[in-house]
Amino acid sequence: MGAQSKYAQQLNNERSLAPFIPFRSQVGPTTVITRDGDFVRTWRIAGLAFETQDKEKLLIRKDQLNTLFRAIASNNVALWSHNVRRRTWDHLKSFFSNPFCDALDKKYYGSFSGYRMMSNELYLTVIYRPVPAKISRLFNVAVHRSHAEILQEQQLAIRKLDEIGNQIETSLRRYGGDDGRGIEVLSTYEDKHGALCSQQLEFYNFLLSGEWQKVRVPSCPLDEYLGTGWVYAGTETIEIRTANATRYARGIDFKDYANHTEPGILNGLMYSDYEYVITQSFSFMTKRDGKEFLTRQKQRLQNTEDGSASQIMEMDIAIDQLGRGDFVMGEYHYSLLVFAEDMETVRHNTSHAMNILQDNGFLATVIATATDAAFYAQLPCNWRYRPRVAGLTSLNFAGLSCFHNFRAGKRDGNPWGQALTLLKTPSGQPAYLNFHYSKGDEDNFDKKLLGNTRIIGQSGAGKTVLMNFCLAQAQKYLHNAPMGMCNVFFDKDQGAKGTILAIGGKYLAIRNGEPTGFNPFQMEPTAGNILFLEKLVQVLVSRDGQHVTTTDESRISHAIRTVMRMRPELRRLSTVLQNVTEGSDRQDRENSVAKRLAKWCFDDGTGKRGTFWWVLDCPQDQIDFNTHSNYGFDGTDFLDNADVRTPISMYLLHRMELAIDGRRFIYWMDEAWKWVDDEAFSEFANNKQLTIRKQNGLGVFATQMPSSLLNSKVASALVQQVATEIYLPNPKADYHEYTDGFKVTNEEFDIIRSMSEESRMFLVKQGHHSMICRLELNGFDDELAILSGSSDNNELLDQVIAEVGDDPSVWLPVFQERRKARIASSKSTGR
């Protein structure tokens, strides 16, 4: 070699990798055969999301895994499992026509720069050994066999491997999402050039080189083909060189084991910020060999007087359990190879990993003897290179290799395309947030699936920011939407005002006594709209418990149909009043429709304004979903006004219903319980929760008062008809509200209560699976001034827009400048 490593003196010279590679050829799409005639197959396992799983369920899964191992146990069978933690990177594709959304998106994904995004990948390899004993192998090789006999034996072995594989796939398919696709066999495939490639060989090559790359199925022996790097082994350190990089690795194994191996005992490593490969192998013993091993262990304890009476008794119990078939015995080995780009970092990472292992009761040590052997023992079938082989029960193995992983959500193939956004997690695993819940690797694009989402979070936990951030990110779904997209936000305390206006939307704060900007009679004069107007006016004239007669209905209908034939600028409630005929007798006139309707009109017929004219009798209607695709309505005032709440709700919901026409549609409700307290909204929410998915829409509901939501008129619909649940930290969470009301598990409830309110973490749940995510917006002061919806910023925003207009590209810079000046002035005053 020309260039010498900085540490070349302490590293051995280069050696060919071929002697250390046991594989000979690929004999089928999913099967590799070794030089010794063993048949090898590997699966990728999604893994069991352990972070939010109840401990009892994890123990059940461990027992089920032990049952699987017992079912496939034979001295012809061995297992290799791998946990690969590696650095990854991702960025969701987004296109925003709105400058605020575009800038927020770019800055948000820019904040991932320097962030250690990691992924954990789990693999299980099964080896079927037709002739497991070494002497038998030599005898088998010595016997001359015809090509037909060899082929027949190979087919028999593959069939046996198929049987074992079917058992494994049946048992482990639940180790992933709800779709039963938790396991996937590594197979051959054709690349775009038509060349046959192998995922299985790519994995084995990764174990040798540390790099993922396409590997074609060769015609030459695999041991001469695999391995695209150079491996140098020193006393404690291995250097791996490839054409792209040089990396260093150090190995760790166990000198002694923890007393108990509950499932997930090694999970602490999965939160580390460095790359590693954990390799574990388990070669099944016969029952006789297993019993002999345990008996020898018992005798050793007795002879050396190292064992206590309880330890000897435990050995007796183990021998009895083995005899009953509670577990099987096997030869086990463990190695952890930690990687880094330089020697100093790999030492630091190794020290960190050892501390984690020792904290869990293992006596871990750096591999200093035959370090290359530990490296090559990563490859399945390399029995002779395994360091520190120990006898272990299948129950212990099920605890050590329990296939735990993190939930990640679904990146692609969602009903509206890619995931809504990418979130950070405690483990570094990328988490993909979606409204819709769609299963596994299915391509559900344009499918009408349930997407209703519920957000629960107490004041100060970040609920408003999260909702507004999701609203801004959802604007990307407008791009390439065949029929467009619309968002309607039913707000409380104007929390979404800044965001709605910044994304180019229209925001109407409905205040008691002030014109709402609503004029229902300027809608298109369609049959459906006219029927709605008739119903609306009937509600107006019956608000005081007044009865609407058949004659009243006829007069209302006549007046409305007359007005709706006029030009739009003439159509309004006052004009309807002018066209309502009164009765002939005095009693009828005193309680006429006209007199009851007058209080809702700008002109009550005598030149005076009615008490509630400001509600629905404005000269120009301000709602037009053709000019704005985002609307916000603040209900803080009117939701507590029983006189006007229902008519306003009816009109808002009718206009929204007209916009639900197949375009992508989201309606948002902050403090949803307050909105659905009105009869019109409760009826709408109850129906729409069930049907809106068929219309390509969804609802997002939020509250900081779970009890109010659970006690609402439509609680069952708001709880049951939900695809995605988001729970922000709440140290005061009520157990019964969350577990009985929202059906979170005990473990999920504990997480919700224990998360720090300042952590910006939250729990996302879809189906029976959940994950812990974090929306990190450090350094986003300008954006948070919009997303947080604070009262002082809203007041400033109103002032700026009144001066410079409602174009976000104009008012946003002025708003930020004045906001910062206000903060600076406040600081100087406080000094």
Swiss-Prot record:
Keyword Nucleotide-binding appears in the UniProt entry: yes
Claim: ATP-binding is one of the keywords in the record: yes
A Pfam family assignment: P-loop_TraG
Binding site for ATP: G457, Q458, S459, G460, A461, G462, K463, T464
Gene3D superfamilies: P-loop containing nucleotide triphosphate hydrolases
Annotated signal peptide: none
Record function comment: The virB operon is essential for intracellular survival and is not involved in the invasion process. Constitutes a major determinant of virulence in mice.
PANTHER family registered for this protein in UniProt: TYPE IV SECRETION SYSTEM PROTEIN CAGE, UNCHARACTERIZED PROTEIN YJGR-RELATED
Annotated protein name in UniProt: Type IV secretion system protein virB4
Gene source species: Brucella abortus (strain 2308)
Gene: virB4
